[in-house]
Amino acid sequence: MNTKVSRQYAKISENSIQKISLALATPEDVLEWSRGEVHRPETINYKTFKPERGGLFDELIFGPLVDYKCSVCGRKYRKSNENQLCIATKECKIRGSRILSKMARRYSMGHIALNAPILHFWFFKIDHSIIAKLLGLKVFEGNSKVPTTITKAAIENLIYYKSHIVLETGGLKSLEQNKIIDISEAGLIYKNALIEIIEFYPPGSEEHNALAESISELADVTSSKIGREYGVDYYELNEIIEEFSSARIATGALAIEYLLDKIDLRAEKAAVEAELAGVQKQIYKNKKIILKNQKRDKLYKRLQVINAFINSGQDPKMMIIRNLPVIPADLRPLVQLDGSRHSTSDCNELYRRIIIRNNRLKRWKAAHAPVIIIQNEMRMLQEAVDALIDNQKKSTNQVTTKEGRPLKSISDALTGKKGRFRQNLLGKRVDYSGRSVIVVGPKLKMHQAGLPRKMAAVLFEPWIIRNLIQEKKVGSIKMARKMIEEENPIIWPHVAKVIQNKPIILNRAPTLHRLSIQAFEPVLVRAKAIQLHPLVTAGFNADFDGDQMAVHIPISPEAIRETQELMFADKNILGPKDGEPIVNPSQDMVLGLYYLSQEKAGAKGEGSFFSTYEAMLKAYEFRSVELHARVVLPFEQVKPFIAKTMRGHLISTVGKFILNNIFPANFPFIFDDNVDELELNYPSQIKKYVLPYGTNFREYIQNLKVNEPLNKKAIAKIVRQIFDTYDGLLAKEDIATVIDQLDFGNYQNCVLRYEKLRDYKKQKLPVPHLSKLSEFTIFEYSQLYKQLQQNGPVESYRVLEDHEKAELLEKIWFKYNNMVCSILDKIKDLGFHYSTLSGTSIAISDIKMAPKKHEFIKEGENYINKLNTFYAKGLITDDERYVLAIAKWTQIKNDIQEDLNQSIKDDNQNSLVMMMKSGARGNISNFVQLAGMRGLMANNVKALKVDAENERVVRSIVEVPVKSSFLEGLTSFEFYSSTHGARKGLTDTALNTAKSGYLTRRLVDVAQNIVVVAEDCFSDFGFVVKDIIDTKTNTIIVPLLERIEGRFLNKDVYDSRGIKLASAGTMVDLQTAKKIVAAGIKKVEIRSILSCHIKNSVCKKCYGKDLATNRLVSIGEAVGIIAAQSIGEPGTQLTMRTFHTGGVANVEDITGGFTRLIELIDSHEHPWGKPAKISPYYGIITKISDLAEKNAANKGFLITIEYKTSKNEKAEHIIRIEQSQKLRVKVGDKVIPGQKLVEGPIILKELLAVSDARTLQNYLLKEIQRIYRMQGISISDKYIEIIIRQMLSKVQIIENGDSNFFIGSIVDISDYQEVNGQLISQNKNPAFGNVIVKGAKQIPLLSNSFLAAASYQETSKILVHSVISSQIDKLEGLKENIIVGHKIPAGTNSNYEPKSKFDIRNPLSFFMKNNR
């Protein structure tokens, strides 16, 4: 049942909330919320420290300080008496004391009955004054026929009693309607008004004499010094004018209230729409009228405010406060410090000022004080209420502490990082959590983490206490708690017992992406540090140099199940960013595997034959054969599966036999570092290493080429292929169906039942999966059989209990899903073991000097001397000399690097070289600095925008390089230069991290509500993709293969012979993608997020493959957040140095790096550098001529484009280009709208204006991809598409037709299409609008959810507009549901499909009788 609840919010459950709406609170609403009036400014009694009656902490109003204690007589009650009235004494009955818990102090409100109407600060200060827009006051000054609009500042002066306004002219010509009377012109205006009024009365009459006297007094005052300085007495004159005429002049909130009461909103709307139509016509006639555009924008905003009040049906007078709510006492606490001192919330001081001024005003009114004193008190009261509402926004008279700090008002408590939204609603402190330093846990399994037992004892305390009491180790909770605190040895077995099947969640800050939070099975360790598996560190971006991690405990059964099924480390093998494994071995492990897989010609024991693998190991242990020696084993000993088809002996090193032994029997044998597509290349590769019986082994091996060992990249490829081969293909439900059919008599034949199952692609299970599943099933059944036999004989046909089946299912399911991780664990163990055995250590003698270094340095110095000579002769400029010098030293360093590369090419025993070649640590660049030269250093120069626009050389690199290497040692200048450069790197990184974090936050807000919600949206619009090519360098940025793999086709794909390669509606897998590219196809039309028809969400087919699971995305996946994290997480790696070449600020520099990314995502109107000129038409370049002007600085070109008009007539368009801009076109070139004519960044709004949304989408996608790919970071297109879709998701209405939209409003594109569809179906006029591009900063503010928008930025502005329009938040997105305490509408709380990753039912449910 849907019930509208608008009062007593504390009494409803947050789970029952379906919608939230904001509205203006009426004085009656405030009285209904309130439990009493606060009329005294006191807080607590200074002697007793008890709250004062009628004060800001009154227990009768705000609730008791002690649970269920009467606030009047002090009598204590039970919880069962809650909400009853205390009747213990007569005073209790009179005061109506209610029995409540102290929690009431968090939601019980009071009120202050104001003795004067006060205008709510937000409505005249936020967003250029809502009141000014609503009233739209205009006045005809003198004889002018064009009215002057009264400004926001003039209305503020009116509110603060600094000026008066003519509310009614009373037929007086000297008074203009809405005229603001300032102190400077008051004397003249009042004089003219009185002269006009006196004419209505006959001379000699009482009225005439009184008016004549007033005119005489006014003349005396205005001519006197006091009158000129302090002005006239407004109030006396106003009374005279109102007494003798029907004119009315007023000031303050009363004047505004009068104006709001008189306004006719519908008439105002009609007038504004008529004026808007006139302005629109003028703009269409002449598009260059900038002032008219500004006027139109002002009218749009005014219309928006008027429409808000009309549609919400609210009375604008409710913007005036008569009863001021007082927030609950516990939300503005008074805390006792040491001794008798107290610390209080700033709000209490602000409330106190209001009460004091309000009470004083009441006394002045009662004493009939002069009007001027009362008006002054009302102004002070207005200022006091303003300070309470929003002290920071007050331009003057901010209320400050003694130290000068502005007090925090209610608005400040909402906004910013420390405000209610971000500090208390979106981010909360979590109980059952702890943190500690992390250390490596090399012996852990991948799903395990080492938890210090002291932490476990505290985190799992309630369970341990229950266990101790159940087993009668203690008699009470208190004793158990004491035992845990004292760390009594009795507790440790119970701690170990309690943590079974209780996963823990580890989080490392900064949580940049979802791999920063993963779940593990806890393993108790005696140390105080958390042990972390070495392979998962990459996901957390953790190292062991003092990093700390937080631990959290999921408590409810649902949370535990979700943690185990979705968050365990074995479910997070692929990185969501690019779909590549993130658990690749690194450092020690890589070094160990590199050492293990090395081959050495002529090593001890080479050519030896061993009949078994164990015999080979024994020989290696007895040192009769070396690890790197190539030996021979019978084929069936190594690969028994293939031995049936291939006979003979296999050649490899001892190390490689050991390495291959850890892989499953049906995984291809790894012979060398050529590990691409092992399955496909296996038959051709294996022939070289298989010897028929009777071959001379030693002779054959001597002629065999020595293979390269496995480096980091090769190992990563192997890991990927392990994942592709052994990642689970079945759902839990499938395995449950098999278990349900098995008993102790037939479990040995389980493989027959598994053969009948089909994987998620509807295909038969591969042999590796069948063999492993049957192996796990047979093992678990036999274990259970043995266990049951201990209690007596077990019949083979015995039917298993449901709980036994569920237990079997859990064990088999875990092993099946853990296949990849178990192999990775073996790789890890092997890597660590052999890196230790390799004995790798480094000495200074390992660094080999570059042989030709000094020759290259000499060459560079000679070149620089020549440059200096040319410069001295005036043949080159200083800038040219600098650029050439930098280029030369860069080339010299590259030459030294190449020379070093050649010298260490065959040095495989050098430890440093081994580390570098294997990819364990360091690269050739580090080696060059050690053994060659350090090279050029960064210079800390501020690059200005004007430098980029004028293409000046920015000297961001020190001209003199560091010629020494670290081996030789640096001179004092070189040392200084080095530290200077290093420091710049550190500061850049620190600044970059903060900017990157802010970018991620904005992106999350942009895309947070995008969730996969449907199977198919049936869109027939596609998105044509091709290689993304950098047109400047003509290099491929993103190949077609990457862009189509994992996406659905929108149209059939045919090769040049007309043979169909793939059908529309099918997902392109890697093999199909390779086939399409091999056929020479350049363009493919795919389903895209940019064309998806689902409102604010996306369907499975438009999204395609989930990169984190390597299969089709599941319904419920929060792809918007994944996209934001994937783009934001590598942001820190993007360089912030705009001019990283140190040369001329050319286009390549300007368009690279973090700065350019921010420009694109925020849709900057003034990008860094000189913007590119673009073609506005389809046409041909007919002429490029020099622009000859007298002023040499204005030289440039004129590009003439010939195009056809709508009437098919030829026309010319001339574009002026500055001389410094580089042309990208020549005469005769065909151009299309949006095409660059010169180098430089394109302004997004301009591109959208001359082309269409699809062109802009392609441009953004290409530019963002280029920025990341230049840094070697690969991000999937689909993530960028999600952000681009949001950037282009709004339409600005230019004609409203028969719709309810108003001209100038910005609406969601899906709402626009929906409304227009309905209008067209009813034969009505549709609305017309233009798609607009908005940056990531503005999109969240335009959200349909005011909660999501207000929690992002500009909180007060969002709330003001939501209040006046009475906006309804339907709680559709993720943020708004978190704010109200709901589960998010994604993942396990979405309408997921059966057998999907989010279908995490209790295993028992698969075997329940009613489930069959």
Curated annotation (Swiss-Prot):
Residues annotated as binding Mg(2+): D543, D545, D547
CC terms in the record's Gene Ontology section: DNA-directed RNA polymerase complex
Protein name in UniProt: DNA-directed RNA polymerase subunit beta'
Q: Which reaction does it catalyse?
A: RNA(n) + a ribonucleoside 5'-triphosphate = RNA(n+1) + diphosphate
Q: Which residues bind Zn(2+)?
A: C1017, C1092, C1099, C1102
Indicate the transmembrane segments per the record: none
Q: Does the keyword Phosphoprotein apply?
A: no
Q: List the lineage, top down.
A: Bacteria, Bacillati, Mycoplasmatota, Mycoplasmoidales, Metamycoplasmataceae
Q: Which cofactor does it need?
A: Mg(2+); Zn(2+)
List the HAMAP family: RNApol_bact_RpoC (MF_01322)
